[in-house]
Amino acid sequence: MTTIKTSNLGFPRLGRKREWKKAIESYWAKKISKEELDQTLTDLHKENLLLQKYYHLDSIPVGDFSLYDHILDTSLLFNIIPERFQGRTIDDDLLFDIARGNKDHVASALIKWFNTNYHYIVPEWDNVEPKVSRNVLLDRFKYAQSLNVNAHPVIVGPITFVKLSKGGHQTFEEKVKTLLPLYKEVFESLIDAGAEYIQVDEPILVTDDSESYENITREAYDYFEKAGVAKKLVIQTYFERAHLKFLSSLPVGGLGLDFVHDNGYNLKQIEAGDFDKSKTLYAGIIDGRNVWASDIEAKKVLIDKLLAHTNELVIQPSSSLLHVPVSLDDETLDTSVGEGLSFATEKLDELDALRRLFNQNDSVKYDKLKARYERFQNQSFKNLDYDFESVRTSRQSPFAQRIEQQQKRLNLPDLPTTTIGSFPQSREVRKYRADWKNKRITDEAYETFLKNEIARWIKIQEDIGLDVLVHGEFERNDMVEFFGEKLQGFLVTKFGWVQSYGSRAVKPPIIYGDVKWTAPLTVDETVYAQSLTDKPVKGMLTGPVTILNWSFERVDLPRKVVQDQIALAINEEVLALEAAGIKVIQVDEPALREGLPLRSEYHEQYLKDAVLSFKLATSSVRDETQIHTHMCYSQFGQIIHAIHDLDADVISIETSRSHGDLIKDFEDINYDLGIGLGVYDIHSPRIPTKEEITTAINRSLQQIDRSLFWVNPDCGLKTRKEEEVKDALTVLVNAVKAKRQE
């Protein structure tokens, strides 16, 4: 009888209660020493390794743990240091400065990791001298060995690493070839240290362009074969289907495939005989991106099918578990929903149950998980009927007519200024919210505090001279979780944190049932803020596409249906704000681009559904009500027409870290709606100069009609300190005032 093995691609860094985040931010704030930071993170890494060992994984990843981002780790490993940061010792402080910027230099670009909500730091190739310079991977592998952990090193592969990079005069192929001797050196050091195999992540090979990379991919892995290391390499792909026949022809020891998010194609390729049985198959059968418990019986059937076409089978999650929370152990959830959930730790338990069943004929754990899954499935979460047809999906008049009415009503100046929505969540804000949630203070005391904070920041905005104000979102812990707490059909966890970028953690709500608006969500705070000023105050909402993409979605209904349910709920809130006298309403869609499928054959339908959902949420307002939206930076070229089709009166886009790249996306489209391209980077504590903001404005006006252009920061200001915000916004307003005089 063929036995199976179990493995993992990566584990969450945050810790069960965000110990990782707290330690790093304490170090940045100079509250702990570097030695204390190192000890805390070493202890957390040890805890992660031993936890995975407890679930009897045959091999446990190292190299997934990082102080910020694994792509940035790889950049430092190979001395791919941005030119402005060169000449310094390559250490953790340099790593943090590249990621966050400092008073002298801007940070490197931050971009979504494929179609997830994780962000990586983009490697920069301008005037670099690649070499192996900081082999932290080897250190961490040796540390795992010291714990008697059977570990395998993890590194992003050369094809993916270079493709996710920017800058430099070399071609894509030349950059890959430059790195091959360096990868070889790293591989040899790991093999010499005892690595049985090395996990080489090449998710770029599941994208549309993967065929265009096949020649250089073959050349790269042929190089590793000639160097005598290829058989120790396992190429891992995830998030979509791969071209299996090509991958099987590469001279490596094993291949990892995603059998969850591949729409069934990878299994079809296996059954068609496209897999080279001399290799080990690493089968991603447990969903690494969602929190629902596996249909364990269906996974058994899948394993049986795979065993018929393989000689060596390793089962694993479909991707790194970085994208899900650590554990359910600390949650106190309603059993009706809780039984259907599985976080990172529970997913390891599912792997262990299958290993025991196949290798030891031990079905105790398997039977328990099977019964639990069946109990959850026997419940009904489809209880509501929806009348989608009765809601408008287009505005009453074209933009050219609407903008005249809006300008007459708002009376805004040339180059109007605004912010994206949130202001700093100080320790005091967080304490009051926690005290209120834990019933340590009364509703009245909390409401009084919120009103005082709103009033204080309305005055700050007026004193600075902004044109369209916001209430600051002090009542919100997160732009999606807040709505998850208030809309029917969502479940909010206590410790369900996942990493978004760097130390930024989010707690995605879980959509388990039909979504419904039952009462106003934001009206009281927005109306109060508007009562304090004659300037317009924006209502601030999160859009349906983003709420869905930044939640753990239910899987018993099509995405479009769930998305439209959310859209109807947001539409109710939009109309409630309008009825309360709010003249400008922002419905943010920062996650619209990141949800774009990796394969272009699915793009058109995704974008069509996204545009319709946004219009369901926003089109019922009167012409004189101005609808804004906001998006985070990514490669917008693929969706620029869909952005236009949203028909938002104003869109603001995070652009400063793109170093002007986004402007190119507007060269091929006559964008005739209002737009604000972020003029400074809010992810960095660095205060922009007046000259930098003026340059950003001038660059934008080369492509965008001045009468349509707004000036704003990149994103919400929640994570910045109060003085940083006031100083940066003052510079922004002064730059705009000077520009108006030209």
From Swiss-Prot:
Entry binding sites for Zn(2+): H630, C632, E654, C715
Sequence positions that bind L-homocysteine: I420, G421, S422, E473, D588
Q: What is its EC number?
A: 2.1.1.14
User: Per its UniProt record, what SUPFAM superfamilies does this chain match?
Assistant: UROD/MetE-like (SSF51726)
Please state what class of enzyme this protein is. transferase
Binding annotation for 5-methyltetrahydropteroyltri-L-glutamate: R18, E19, W20, K21, K112, W550, E594
Superkingdom, natural source: Bacteria
Q: Which reaction does it catalyse?
A: 5-methyltetrahydropteroyltri-L-glutamate + L-homocysteine = tetrahydropteroyltri-L-glutamate + L-methionine
Instruction: Please list the cofactors this protein needs.
Output: Zn(2+)
Pathway connected to this protein: Amino-acid biosynthesis; L-methionine biosynthesis via de novo pathway; L-methionine from L-homocysteine (MetE route): step 1/1
Checking InterPro entries in the record gives: Cbl-indep_Met_Synth_N, Cobalamin-indep_Met_synthase, Met_Synth_C/arc, UROD/MetE-like_sf
GO molecular function terms listed in the Swiss-Prot or TrEMBL record = 5-methyltetrahydropteroyltriglutamate-homocysteine S-methyltransferase activity; zinc ion binding
Q: Which residues bind L-methionine?
A: I420, G421, S422, E473, D588
Q: Which GO terms describe its biological process?
A: methionine biosynthetic process; methylation
Q: Where is the active site?
A: H683 (proton donor)
Cofactor binding annotation: Binds 1 zinc ion per subunit.
**Keyword tags:** Amino-acid biosynthesis, Metal-binding, Methionine biosynthesis, Methyltransferase, Repeat, Transferase, Zinc
CDD domains noted in UniProt: CIMS_C_terminal_like, CIMS_N_terminal_like
Role description = Catalyzes the transfer of a methyl group from 5-methyltetrahydrofolate to homocysteine resulting in methionine formation.
**Protein family per UniProt:** Belongs to the vitamin-B12 independent methionine synthase family.
The name on file for this protein is 5-methyltetrahydropteroyltriglutamate--homocysteine methyltransferase
